[in-house]
Amino acid sequence: PFFLVKPVVFLPVNTPWQYNPLPYDPDGDSLSWSLGIPHDESTGNPTGIPIAGYTNPPSASGTTFSIDPLTGTISWTASVLGNFVYTVTCEEFRNGVKIGEIRRDMQFIVLPSVPTPQLLPPNNISSSYNGVPLALAVAGYPFTLNLFAMDSSVTTILAEAFGEPFLLNNPMTFLQGNTDDPFKTKLSLMWLPSINEVRENPYLVVVRLMNGTFSMDYSLY
């Protein structure tokens, strides 16, 4: 497997925040995400050794630094300013047997808080899969999912979308457009899936919103 989404460095203090590195396996093997211990350099050991005494970055009261094992979404409400290191581990399973894993050591820099871009709750998705919004598409029929994002502090929101549907021979497309509200933008996911894309497990898509200072990732199926 490999990661589809580039790392995020900056995030706001005392603000609920999400990031998804989105590991992907082209062979279709099962993936499980977890938080690991960052490694330090070690002579003669190319992978390094776990940092002794490492603890997860500090979180606001009643919250934890956590990762969803199914989607890979990292959730954190940082409680203090500073630089923090963490590790995402993605294990690969085939027929219930672990056959490999990848790690990504990353750094977060927590800065004073300003408003972050938010994805408005989609009113055209009524289903969910393990608590994540689930949109249904039918093979042979055009599929369009319109979403809206808002940021009260800026009039320019940039958006990107990542996921397996964009890597297929018959790829999904992603468009961003204006609305009547200068602080609000429209996002459209469009696809014409064929019978070849039909499968039991849903496709995971990550939408990233950026306001020039911070970004927020949102996962949906």
Label each residue range with its predicted role.
Residues 54-78, 170-194, 206:
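Strand-loop-strand motifs at the edges of beta-sheets in extracellular beta-sandwich domains
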Residues 9, 28-66:
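Short helix-loop boundary/capping segments
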Residues 39-43, 48-52, 155-179:
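Surface-exposed binding patches on compact interaction domains or structured appendages
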Residues 1-28, 97-153, 215-221:
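Extracellular interdomain linkers/hinges and stalk-like, low-complexity segments
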Residues 17, 25-39, 153-164:
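Solvent-exposed loop segments of extracellular immunoglobulin-like
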